[in-house]
Amino acid sequence: MTYIENIFLCMVSPLLVAALCMGRRQLRLFLFCIAGMGVCLLSAYINTFLAAMCQADALAATAEIAPVVEEMMKLLPLVFYLLVFEPEGDKIKAAAITVALAFATFENVCYLIQNGADRFSFIFFRGFGTGAMHVLCGLIVGGGLAYTWRRTWLKVAGTCGLLGAVITLHAIYNLLIAYGGAAQYIAYALPVLLVAAGRLSIFRLSRKQ
């Protein structure tokens, strides 16, 4: 049995100490890191509860329950940030990526502790794939929120649309992972390639301008 709340405390403790030492400018970064790990912890409990309540098998829990719960939980700190502080677009994107990155880091650490770290090649691909998938979802949500929340009429519909898009992407990723074999490695490679392609296109556009 993995006591993920103990892992959470061990990982968050140095972040809290660093946040106190770094000053107000960097405080936001550490708070979003802690929020990302916190929602990952809560997502694990909610996933387990819903899977037990719905009597879902492993595939249903992975492809149907987990993507919805995890993406909704990752959105909550961002919505709170938007409602309370009304930040600028660049700050929204940075917050979304930080939450997603912290979520992926905590998830990977828990996976390593539960399943072991003896298979380097598999862990390598999983680490990059899962991290890139969560960061890609963060990029989509962050960029989308920065656009939609500047327009009052688009806030609710835009947020729901972005949530639906990242849930679908997350579900496809989890389905490919659950299928196993070559599909599993395609799933690990796909988000990395999408992030790389996105960065390359942005670089080319900036050079043309």
Q: Model-found features: residue ranges?
A:
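Hydrophobic alpha-helical segments at protein termini of multi-pass membrane proteins
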Residues: M1-Q209
